[in-house]
Amino acid sequence: MNSRLVLALVSVLALASAGARADDAQPRRYAVISRIGDSLTLVRHEPEVGSHLDRNDHESLTLPDAGIDHMALLAVDKALKQADPSAQVTLLDSAPPAEGAAAAPLLDGSDQFVPGEALLAALRKTGATHLLLLSKYRSETLMKARHSHLGSGKLEGLGFYLDYTQKMRRADTGESGRGFIAPYAYYRVSLIDLATLKVVKHHEVRASNTVSVARSQDSFDPWEALSASQKLNMLLRFIRVETPPAVADVMQP
């Protein structure tokens, strides 16, 4: 082979390699949106009678502020900076909703991100290359008990599952009662390439914990087994604990 041609090829390869390294060195810019904390759902178990249909009673409670979503954004921000210290992060605490209803899905069935014009404009303004989206995830009810999982039907988002008939026993005192409350968090963390609006990777979170009615001192109502602050703190703890590994997972190639 002609020596000049060899030198030319070596030079081209060297330039290409240097260019690739320069591209790799460019830090990603992330935008973060959370759409999991606008409401809570109370799910009251209804015994199934010869059917696999979800007969549970679902009651949605709209929350007055974005406190839960704000905490979720902070959890993602911390996890992102641990996974990629060079990352530039923009938290969209008041991102415009998708076109139509505020609760409209932002992902379609083919893993395509479908923002409205206002949201897309807000994302473009940040200069972000990627989006981390926290969205509600619907799946089978699997409430975590000590040695098993309980419940029926399907759950989505954040809320509380209430059962009034299941016999439960406290592990610490041995006291028993019928019924339990189970705070739960069912959500999905998605990494989205904003150049193509395609999902790069998903991670689904299904977190829950059952609390026996036996913990309620003056009531047989499972709802009273936890105070208002305990209910909220358990939901927030799910987000703090489950979000970092979910973010780390979607960041992996």
Tell me the role of every PLM-derived stretch.
Residues 11-13:
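Repetitive helical segments and hydrophobic/amphipathic motifs
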Residues 46-171, 184-188, 192-202:
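N-terminal segment of the mature soluble domain
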Residues 15-19:
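N-terminal signal peptide c-region/cleavage motif recognized by signal peptidases
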Residues 22-44, 142, 147-253:
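C-terminal/domain-edge helix-coil "capping" segments
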Residues 1-7:
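Bacterial N-terminal signal peptides that target proteins for export
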